[in-house]
Amino acid sequence: MAKKVVGYIKLQIPAGKANPSPPVGPALGQRGLNIMQFCKEFNAKTQQLEPGMPIPVVITAYADRTFSFITKTPPNTYFLLKAAKISKGSQTVGKSAAVGSVTTAQLREIAETKFKDMNANDIDGAVRMLAGSAKSMGLNVVEG
């Protein structure tokens, strides 16, 4: 028989850096889950990734106070900022000059990495979604 699910917890945690401090500790503590066990398992699962890379995680809490979790690919903004070699997007999109640029080849590469977590039917659709995200961050999309 399947375990009874009591809730889902969605967090974004840096790869290999889960610890009991907020936001992880309070979120898991409210459901009565073992915080240290989660931190050890998450850090072990993400140790091969670039340290500090933000990893979205969905934790499923069960009635018997056990849990399971699924890691997803980092957010689009992380990849776009990395491709443009900048630290943050524009604060005034459309009013000031673009803060950087990304090529369509870079967008295609990001789309291939992110495709399984995106709500797109094909790679071209994913590229268009990423182009929209880039534009809203103040990045120019150039052919190449």
Curated annotation (Swiss-Prot):
SMART domains linked: RL11 (SM00649)
Gene Ontology BP terms: translation
Keywords: Methylation, Ribonucleoprotein, Ribosomal protein, RNA-binding, rRNA-binding
PROSITE patterns given in the database record: RIBOSOMAL_L11
Keyword Transcription: no
GO CC list: cytosolic large ribosomal subunit
Molecular function in Gene Ontology: large ribosomal subunit rRNA binding; structural constituent of ribosome
Post-translational modification (record): One or more lysine residues are methylated.
Matching CDD domains: Ribosomal_L11
Entry keyword RNA-binding: yes
Gene3D superfamilies assigned: Ribosomal protein L11, C-terminal domain (1.10.10.250), Ribosomal protein L11/L12, N-terminal domain (3.30.1550.10)
Similarity comment: Belongs to the universal ribosomal protein uL11 family.
Assembly and binders: Part of the ribosomal stalk of the 50S ribosomal subunit. Interacts with L10 and the large rRNA to form the base of the stalk. L10 forms an elongated spine to which L12 dimers bind in a sequential fashion forming a multimeric L10(L12)X complex.
HAMAP family noted in UniProt: Ribosomal_uL11
Known role: Forms part of the ribosomal stalk which helps the ribosome interact with GTP-bound translation factors.
UniProt protein name: Large ribosomal subunit protein uL11
Species in which this protein is naturally found: Gluconobacter oxydans (strain 621H)
